[in-house]
Regions:
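Short cysteine-rich clusters marking metal-coordination/redox-active sites
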Residues: 345
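Acidic, metal/ion-coordinating pockets
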Residues: 1-324, 333, 337-340, 348, ...
Length: 352
């Protein structure tokens, strides 16, 4: 809980320094550390209510419902949703198959519309009347609907790593999967077809930062300038290789001449790639349609020495005071226990 004031300060600092449009999202398993809680007031429930209050103060854009978020049932989730907390889950449904939370939302950041979908992973014990629908059934239509309204498609997922990989392979229109797997730590962005998959370690020890240079192509890749430089360097390397090969004494051997021919063909193919890329770059200068989308990432460790946001620190202090009051109410103080004396003992024990 204490790390949230540092997280808030870092998010504010980065937003101020970069002066770029941004989204603050969470893929779930936010509220609790165990799969189920007993009924009634508890330290865990007070902490969860505090986390929701802090995230609202931090103006979170979207949070997917994770399995651990259901540890105390639907009550805290439903209440906070009614107050405007942006819970998402496309596959948590009631007995009639109706979503219990918004399946997706569209957030506009700068001049880009981000379509954000939430999927909940396997739940050990579902609350009464709640069903976990198969994402394979509902996701195709939901992606089509969301894609029509957005420029970039983002999935907040607490599904297993294997399922996230399956989604990336099956739905290349999805640009980004932010995972919340309980057993994984910080995950470097991995590209599967045209989908990036990444996640930040659990328990709020790190702040994950993904900076995206987005273009209309919606295609991840190197910058075309970098790719062009690499191709030109490749031509230089092939030229050097051909010079060495042509100096060989066995130049008249048919097999060796065939090897030279293959390298020459490789060089010609790279030259064609360079010309095509130069043409694409010229077109990008006019409309930017073909430019690749690029990114960089950082996992920022939230250390004790970091600065904190005062308003968040005040909320945390209030939560701790509520927890102390809860514990105090459970301790019986100043209870008089009468001294029985020998007469009281004689009612049960024989005199000796």
């Amino acid at each position: 809980l204490g790390g949230l004031s540092k997280k808030a300060w870092q998010i504010r600092r980065i937003s101020t320094e970069q002066q770029k449009p941004s989204l603050f999202v969470d893929s779930g398993n936010l509220l609790f550390k165990q799969v189920q809680l007993p009924d009634g007031p508890s330290q865990e429930l007070l902490t969860a209510e505090g986390i929701i209050k802090i995230y609202r103060t931090m103006k979170v854009d979207a949070v997917a419902v994770g399995p651990l978020d259901l540890a105390s049932g639907l009550g805290i989730l439903t209440h906070s949703r009614q107050q405007g907390f942006p819970w998402l889950s496309a596959n948590l449904v009631d007995e009639e198959g109706r979503p219990l939370f918004a399946p997706m939302l569209i957030k506009e950041t700068g001049n880009i519309k981000a379509g954000i979908i939430g999927l909940t992973g396997a739940v050990t014990s579902l609350p009464p009347g709640v069903t976990l629908a198969d994402w394979r059934t509902l996701l195709p239509a939901l992606l089509e609907e969301t894609s029509a309204q957005s420029d970039i498609l983002i999935l907040l997922s607490s599904l297993s790593p294997a399922e996230n990989q399956e989604i990336a392979r099956q739905f290349p229109a999805l640009h980004l999967i932010l995972a919340a797997n309980q057993h994984s730590g910080n995950m470097m962005p991995e590209q599967v077809k045209n989908t990036l998959i990444t996640q930040t370690a659990t328990q709020g020890k790190y702040q994950g930062i993904l900076t995206i240079d987005w273009h209309k192509s919606g295609r991840w890749g190197k910058t075309q300038g970098t790719e062009l430089t690499e191709l030109r360097n490749r031509i230089g390397a092939l030229d050097w290789q051909l010079q060495r090969m042509r100096r060989r004494v066995d130049l008249q051997q048919p097999d060796y001449l065939d090897k030279i021919k293959l390298v020459e063909q490789d060089r010609e193919a790279v030259i064609r790639q360079v010309k095509e890329l130069e043409q694409a770059l010229a077109a990008d200068h006019s409309d930017g349609q073909n430019a690749a989308c690029t990114f960089n990432h950082n996992f920022l460790a939230l250390e004790r020495s970091m600065a904190e946001t005062p308003e968040i620190r005040a909320i945390i202090t209030g939560i701790k005071e509520q927890i102390q009051a809860l514990h105090a109410s459970r301790i019986r103080k100043d209870v008089d226990i009468p001294l029985l004396g020998h007469k009281g003992c004689m009612s049960c024990h024989q005199a000796q």
